[in-house]
């Protein structure tokens, strides 16, 4: 991917925050559980690799692969 490290980290943080917000606001998970669910997932590990391109995907699409 032709994305700077700074842009990649920003996009990763944004999509992660949005996934957590969806889990808490729409699915009713407590914040701590939502954070744990996202950060401890295999998906989050893959999201941390810019080569996967997952940071370009929508939070809802990513969540569909989390559950």
Describe each PLM feature range:
Residues 1-67:
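C-terminal alpha-helical interaction appendages
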């Amino acid at each position: 991917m032709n994305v700077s490290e700074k842009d990649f980290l920003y996009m990763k943080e944004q999509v992660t925050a949005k996934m957590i917000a969806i889990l808490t606001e729409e699915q009713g998970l407590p914040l701590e559980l939502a954070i744990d669910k996202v950060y401890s997932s295999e998906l989050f590990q893959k999201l941390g690799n810019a080569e996967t391109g997952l940071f370009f995907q929508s939070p809802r699409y990513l969540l569909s692969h989390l559950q």
